[in-house]
Amino acid sequence: TVARKRVEADLIFRRVGITFAVYGNNAGTERLIPFDIIPRIIPAHEWSQLQKGLTQRVQDINLFIHDIYHAQHIVKAGVIPAEQIFRNAQYRPEMQDVAVASDIYAHIAGVDIVRAGAGEFYVLEDNLRVPSGVSYMLEDRKMMMRLFPDLFARHRIAPVAHYPDLLLDMLRSV
């Protein structure tokens, strides 16, 4: 049953130590990663379209950051007030006019999406600092393959295990 699989997943995550710290909690509380026992499968035709949009989004984020640290067209045009940029804790004045490799500022982007309806998705947030969810995604996939092997045998589900290799290749390229 689903309830048994939920218990099995929790036991394995606890035994292996797949937890996260609750920030701001002085007690240092460790919790199990949030794991949805019901697999969410995005059909290939939807993923293809979504992937294009997410790729474009990250490219646009890099263009935005480049503009902030160089010409500042978005500020000069009044689209975003200067104080909103320059008083932001993440703004780094020492990066002003610094050329970065391939104009890529965000080498890793954790884009959290939710499905709003058939073929409709929304972005909850873009995490460009430390998208720790990547490691959880890899562990989630391992757990899903363990709990639902027939699902992976019957369907052509895109692999994710090669992500660390892709990340390493990208980091070596800069």
Whereabouts are the PLM-identified features?
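Preference for protein termini
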Residues: 1-174
